[in-house]
C-alpha cells in the first residue's frame, strides 16, 4: 500500500517522532469479501493534486488505474488552494539573483520544523519538487514568471499558476487524465480498506459507497494509493489535539475529514505528527470574504485592534498562529500600500476585488482614514506605520522580522487593510511512510505489500 499525500511535510513542521495510535479511534478493518464487484490494477483514493498525479503516472506506466472522489466534484483541497508552490528551481532562483538549492530548501525545512521531521522524507520532498514543477508543465500548467516569498514560506522560492489558484493544477490534470483515458469517479466514497487479514497479508482493495448508499468491493491487483488529504475540516478531530481550534473556520473543502487515515490505522498503519495543525489568517469571524493582501509578505504588516504590530510577519506559521490567537477577538488586520496591493493582486486579484466590493477590504488615501474604517486608534496606527518605515531604513525590527523582508515602506497611497482571523488550514501529520511512500505496519515496521 502506498501513501502520496501532497500536504505531508509541506511547511516543514510535520513530525515523524511520535505515533498517535489512539487518534479518534482507528476504524475496524473490513472483512475480506468472497467476491469482488470490480477490479483495477491501481485504486487511488482522492482526486486532489496528489491523487490525480498518482493516477496519471500509474496510467502512463500501463496500469489499469482509477481515481475515486467522495465529493461531487474533483480537486480536493488543491482546487480551493491559493496555488503557491515552493520549489528550488535553478533557472528561477538564478534569474531572480537569489541563493537557493534543493539542499538549502531541505536544511530550512528541517530547521522550520524544529528538526522533528523525518530527514529522509524532507530530503525526498525538497530534492524532487523541482521535477514536480516540470511535470506540472508537461500536463499543461502554465506558471507566472518570477518567484516570491509566500506567507509562512520563509524563503523566496514560491510560484503561482497563471490563473492564480490551485484550480489551475486540477484543470490541467483533469484535461490530461481525460486525454489518456484515466477515469476520475466522483460520488465514490471509500468507506474501508481491505487487507487479507487485519494484522497480516497484503492490501487487497477497498469498499466503495455510492451516493444512493449502495456499496461495492473493488479489488486492487497492484496497489491502493491513499491520497485523501488531512482532517482540517473536522473540528472534532482537530480539537482532540488543540482545543483552541474547535471554533475556528477552515480553509479546507468539506471532504477533508480524516476517515481514510483511520482506515489505514485499522489495518496496522502508524499515524504520526497529528498534533501539528497549521493555521493561516483567512476569513475573519462574521465575514464572508478574505482580505488577502498578505501573501507577498515583504509588502505587508499585521496590526491588532489596538493598532500595533504584534509579530514578525515573516515568522513561521505556528508562531503567527499563536500570536494572532492571543489578540483581541482573535482578529487582526494586514496593512499595505498600493504597491503591496498591486503585488498581492498578481496572485489573488479576483479575491481582493470581491473583498473590496463586500466590505471586507478597505481602501483610503491616508492612514488616518484607513484606521477609522477598520476601527483602530488613528494616532496609534500612524505611529506604528512610521515606526515600521524607519525599520525598513535601519533593517532592524524589535519583533525579529528579517532584513530581507524589511524592503518596502508603506508610503504610497491609497492604503489597504481588512480583518482576518486564524483558520484551520493544514494537518501536517498523517500515516507514517517511507521514502517510497509505503506505509509501515505498526510495531513491526514492515511495509504493507
Language-model segments: residues:
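Beta1/beta-strand and adjacent pyrophosphate-binding region of the FAD-binding site
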Residues: 36-48
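Glycine-rich loop(s) and the adjacent beta-strand/alpha-helix scaffold that form part
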Residues: 214, 218-283, 437
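An anion/pyrophosphate-binding glycine-rich loop and adjacent beta-alpha core
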Residues: 257, 261-263, 270-376
Amino acid at each position: 500500500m502506498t501513501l502520496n499525500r501532497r500536504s505531508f511535510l509541506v511547511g516543514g513542521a510535520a513530525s515523524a517522532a511520535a505515533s498517535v495510535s489512539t487518534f479518534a479511534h482507528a476504524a475496524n478493518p473490513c472483512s475480506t469479501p468472497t467476491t469482488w464487484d470490480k477490479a483495477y490494477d491501481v485504486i487511488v483514493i482522492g482526486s486532489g493534486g496528489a491523487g490525480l498525479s498518482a493516477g496519471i503516472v500509474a496510467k502512463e506506466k500501463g496500469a489499469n488505474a482509477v481515481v475515486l472522489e467522495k465529493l461531487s466534484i474533483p480537486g480536493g483541497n488543491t482546487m480551493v488552494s491559493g496555488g503557491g508552490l515552493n520549489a528550488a528551481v535553478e533557472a528561477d532562483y538564478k534569474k531572480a539573483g537569489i541563493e537557493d538549492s534543493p539542499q538549502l530548501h531541505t536544511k530550512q525545512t528541517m530547521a522550520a520544523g524544529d528538526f522533528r521531521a523525518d530527514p529522509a522524507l524532507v530530503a525526498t520532498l525538497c530534492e524532487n519538487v523541482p521535477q514536480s514543477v516540470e511535470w506540472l508543465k508537461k500536463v499543461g500548467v502554465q506558471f507566472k514568471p518570477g518567484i516570491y516569498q509566500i506567507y509562512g514560506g520563509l524563503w523566496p522560492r514560491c510560484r503561482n499558476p497563471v490563473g492564480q489558484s490551485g484550480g489551475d493544477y486540477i484543470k490541467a490534470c483533469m484535461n490530461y487524465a481525460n486525454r489518456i483515458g484515466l477515469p476520475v469517479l466522483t460520488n465514490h466514497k471509500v468507506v474501508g480498506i481491505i487487507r487479507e487479514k487485519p494484522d497480516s497479508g497484503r492490501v487487497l482493495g477497498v469498499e466503495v459507497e455510492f451516493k444512493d448508499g449502495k456499496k461495492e468491493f473493488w479489488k486492487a491487483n497492484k496497489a491502493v494509493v491513499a491520497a485523501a488529504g488531512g482532517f482540517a475540516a473536522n473540528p472534532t478531530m482537530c480539537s482532540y489535539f488543540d482545543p483552541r481550534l474547535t471554533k475556528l473556520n477552515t480553509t479546507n473543502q468539506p471532504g477533508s475529514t480524516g476517515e481514510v487515515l483511520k482506515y489505514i490505522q485499522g489495518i496496522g498503519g502508524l499515524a504520526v505528527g497529528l498534533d501539528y495543525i497549521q493555521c493561516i489568517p483567512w476569513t475573519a469571524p462574521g465575514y464572508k470574504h478574505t482580505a488577502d493582501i498578505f501573501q507577498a509578505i515583504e509588502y505587508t504588516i499585521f496590526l491588532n485592534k489596538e493598532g500595533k504590530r504584534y509579530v514578525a510577519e515573516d515568522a513561521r506559521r505556528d508562531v503567527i498562529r499563536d500570536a494572532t490567537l492571543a489578540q483581541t477577538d482573535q482578529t487582526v488586520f494586514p496593512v499595505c500600500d498600493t504597491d503591496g496591493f498591486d503585488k498581492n493582486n498578481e496572485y489573488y486579484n479576483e479575491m481582493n476585488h470581491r473583498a473590496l466590493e463586500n466590505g471586507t477590504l478597505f481602501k483610503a488615501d491616508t492612514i488616518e482614514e484607513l484606521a477609522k474604517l477598520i476601527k483602530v486608534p488613528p494616532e496609534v496606527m500612524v505611529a506604528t506605520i512610521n515606526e515600521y518605515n524607519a525599520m525598513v531604513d535601519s533593517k532592524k525590527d524589535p519583533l525579529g522580522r528579517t532584513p530581507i523582508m524589511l524592503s518596502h515602506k508603506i508610503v504610497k497611497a491609497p492604503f489597504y487593510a481588512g480583518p482576518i482571523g486564524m483558520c484551520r488550514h493544514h494537518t501536517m501529520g498523517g500515516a507514517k511512510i517511507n521514502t517510497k511512500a509505503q506505509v509501515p505496519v505498526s510495531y513491526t515496521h514492515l511495509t504493507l505489500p
